[in-house]
């Protein structure tokens, strides 16, 4: 995401003034971006190509422009090759691998929980609307409104002005920002790319989206430039909004990552969509047991599924020996496991087909924006803390 932002910025600078220095800066950014993710190459080509097209439309394509274009293209390629030694051993094989892996992520045959449906990525693909729905569900409403408004305004300008829309830095920036998130998103929808954990694999779209939102805000500001009171009210509303969102992040720390926008019903959300994909709640659950379990007694813990098991064991493995020694881990099917504290990651319990605990079984819950990401519960015969 960060390198996408840098590539977008450098393409704006290169288009504004196509010098050798700016071409080299763009080449470095594009090379690093492509090395990080192969989709970064597509973003870099898109940004560079649009900057080139804009220069042609403005009839600013002189000899020095040609030199800058060659430096940018060859420099980006050279930077990518130097950063990617595997490419030198077998260029065709390596490029085939990264392109295939970008289209169909093969290093992780996991599962998705989407709209109450469990999707096994080892043999299924997400529906084409998976990414836009996840973006809509997890993007704050005001930011989403600004993105959609800016996208609509920019598209209208494109239809009206055709290639002339690429004239001028402000208009070009609006079109470039829109293109950098809309075109990749449409491509991923068409290919139904195999991704997991919401739209984490598509976070490179986030900065161009925010750039579109910022452009929309600037359009609103220009409309209100001569209206003192509305301008102040708008600035105050924006500040209040950011304060509310920041407060929400602080209050839900360290589980703020499980955010869903306010229009998403919290009733049964745990069984419809993923929350704690990375077992962050396990750490909080273990710390709660350490603090609240009877002193001087071993803390027996078990789990509901293999992914939660991995989270429990991985967390305990990182603890100092003295703290870790209090915990005794047990398999859920063993005799001792029947009296152990049971740690349950809600997302992984649903993916494994395990029922969520009844209210009278719950000792502790870790919540994010009103939804439970993790429980500690025990059978009736277990020792209560």
Put a short name on every predicted segment.
Residues 55-58, 212-236:
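Cytosolic-side transmembrane helix boundary signature
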Residues 86-89, 93-104, 193, 231-382:
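Catalytic lumenal/periplasmic loop and adjoining terminal transmembrane helix
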Residues 1-9, 23-27, 39-43, 72-76, ...:
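Alpha-helical transmembrane segments of multi-pass membrane proteins
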Residues 17-25, 61, 65, 127, ...:
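Membrane-helix interface segments
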């Amino acid at each position: 995401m960060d390198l996408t932002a840098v590539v977008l910025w450098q393409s704006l600078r290169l288009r504004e003034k196509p010098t050798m220095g700016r071409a080299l800066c763009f080449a470095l950014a594009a090379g690093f971006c492509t090395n990080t993710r192969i989709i970064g190459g597509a973003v870099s080509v898109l940004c560079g190509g649009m900057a080139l097209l804009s220069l042609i439309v403005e009839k600013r394509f002189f000899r020095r422009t040609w030199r800058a274009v060659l430096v940018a293209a060859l420099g980006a390629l050279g930077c990518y090759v130097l950063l990617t030694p595997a490419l030198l051993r077998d260029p065709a094989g390596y490029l085939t691998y990264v392109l295939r892996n970008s289209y169909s992520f093969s290093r992780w045959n996991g599962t998705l929980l989407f709209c109450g449906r469990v999707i096994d990525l080892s043999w299924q693909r997400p529906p084409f609307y998976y990414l836009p729905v996840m973006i809509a569900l997890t993007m704050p409403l005001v930011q989403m409104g600004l993105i959609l408004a800016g996208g609509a305004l920019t598209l209208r300008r494109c239809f009206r002005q055709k290639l002339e829309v690429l004239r001028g830095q402000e208009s070009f920036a609006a079109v470039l920002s829109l293109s950098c998130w809309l075109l990749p998103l449409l491509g991923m929808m068409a290919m139904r790319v195999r991704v997991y954990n919401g739209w984490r694999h598509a976070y490179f779209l986030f900065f161009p989206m925010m750039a579109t939102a910022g452009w929309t805000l600037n359009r609103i500001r220009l409309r209100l430039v001569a209206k003192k009171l509305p301008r102040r009210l708008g600035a105050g509303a924006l500040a209040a909004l950011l304060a509310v969102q920041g407060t929400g992040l602080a209050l839900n720390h360290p589980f703020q990552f499980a955010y869903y926008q306010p229009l998403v019903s919290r009733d049964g959300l745990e069984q419809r969509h993923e929350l704690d994909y990375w077992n962050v709640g396990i750490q909080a659950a273990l710390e709660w047991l350490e603090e609240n379990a009877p002193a001087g007694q071993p803390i027996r813990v078990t789990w509901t599924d293999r992914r939660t098991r991995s989270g429990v064991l991985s967390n305990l493995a990182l603890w100092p020996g003295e703290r870790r020694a209090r915990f005794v881990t047990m398999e859920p099917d063993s005799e001792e496991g029947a009296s152990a504290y049971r740690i349950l990651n809600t997302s992984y319990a649903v993916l494994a087909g395990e029922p969520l605990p009844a209210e009278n079984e719950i000792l502790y819950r870790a919540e994010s924006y009103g939804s439970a990401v993790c429980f500690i519960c025990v059978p009736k015969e277990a020792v209560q803390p």
